[in-house]
A protein has these predicted regions:
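Long, well-ordered mid-to-C-terminal structural blocks that present hydrophobic/aromatic surfaces
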Residues: 278-347
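Metal-cofactor-binding active-site regions of metalloenzymes
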Residues: 2-36, 40-302
């Protein structure tokens, strides 16, 4: 009989014995502290509904995780076979046991990757799995996980308490109504689960459906966005609303960390062209750089911590984007010059 699957307790520490000893000491001092998550992508709906579950093993580990299915897709496994929803609603695999089988057959692909580290940790330490996933044990593991997921102690709220989460910040569009956060506040979770203001869908002029997003911004803010100044006013209104709902931070994605203060007449002109559907790639890049400056200005006023995620070229694979949409595993790192890029903002 094979040995049970276990994880080396030093797996994340330096292999050098001296440095590993220091790492162990530091870890022991903090291991029992509460978790603080300043940035994350947990849907607030999971926690707002006390009866919510995590679904099937495929629902939890495969279908929503583009890090997982990108690896499998890179090795020739169609994303349709993994249940990833297509934009046009065309058929994809719906048998979650088959999806799980494909995952287990190829689990070895995640060896020595960050994805493999967190998959292994969740399977072993959260769900009590004692066998490394393979083609032969896939259905047995599926049954084990499904039984665990059906237990009350494996609901999102129960796991939230088990993990001793002190603060979890979600990522929310500037146009989000935050209704689920409102429900969480009513149930006493407002201090623990907080929204984060992410305005990319309206500040990045190259975003698909940008005009529709701006119209939505008008609706939720109560500001008729007809020009650049009203656009800024609407964003300021939304930031104030997010802060009232407990937000402590903002979050911004940009291909590069370039920042640039545009003269207001130029910002107005670019925005006017965008409303008419006539912007260029250069317009979008410069407007993003300018809006990062504006977001910093607003943060200096309202105190929301500004988080900037740069250095990722999103939707690089056009075929994947056309078929599966945004965040479908085709984001690739690019060089980011932070020193020059942030100089305008920091000065």
């Amino acid at each position: 009989m094979s040995q049970p699957w276990t994880l080396d307790p030093d797996r994340l520490f330096d292999p050098n014995p001296a440095r590993r000893g220091v790492a162990r000491t530091l870890y022991e001092e903090v291991r029992d502290l509460p978790l603080v998550g300043p940035h994350g992508h947990v849907p607030p709906t999971l926690l707002a509904d006390p009866d919510a579950t995590l679904g099937t093993p495929a629902d939890l580990f495969i279908i929503p995780d583009h890090y997982v299915y990108r690896m499998l897709y890179s090795q020739g496994i169609p994303m349709e076979d993994l249940g990833v929803p297509a934009r046009d609603g065309s058929p994809v695999e719906t048998d979650h046991r088959k999806i799980w089988q494909r995952f287990c057959e190829n689990f070895h692909l995640f060896r020595a990757t960050p994805t493999g580290l967190w998959l292994s940790d969740a399977l072993v330490n959260v769900f009590g799995v004692t066998e490394k996933p393979t083609a032969g044990n896939a259905q047995r593991l599926h049954d084990h996980l499904q039984e665990r997921l059906a237990r009350p102690e494996y609901t999102p709220r129960a796991l939230f308490e088990r993990f001793d989460v002190e603060i979890l910040c979600t990522t929310d569009a500037a146009t989000d109504t935050l209704e689920h956060h409102a429900a969480l506040r009513e149930e006493g979770y407002g201090e623990k689960v907080r929204p984060t203001f992410r305005p990319d869908a309206v500040t990045d002029l190259s975003t698909p459906d940008w005009r529709e997003n701006v119209d939505r911004l008008s609706g939720v803010s109560g500001v008729d966005v007809v020009d650049y100044r009203s656009f800024v006013e609407a964003l300021e209104q939304r930031r104030a609303f997010f802060k009232e709902m407990g937000a402590v931070a903002t979050d911004h994605s940009a291909t590069t960390p370039h920042t640039e203060r545009l003269p207001e007449d130029e910002a107005r002109s670019i925005f006017a062209r965008a409303l008419s559907g006539m912007t260029t790639g250069e317009d979008a890049a410069r407007f993003t750089a300018h809006m990062l400056m504006e977001m910093a200005r607003m943060s200096a006023g309202d105190g929301l911590v500004m988080q900037l995620h740069a250095g990722s070229l999103r939707n690089h694979d056009e075929a994947v984007y056309r078929r599966f949409g945004l965040d479908a595993g085709a984001d690739i790192p690019v060089a980011a010059d932070w020193t020059r890029g942030l100089r305008a903002l920091l000065n």
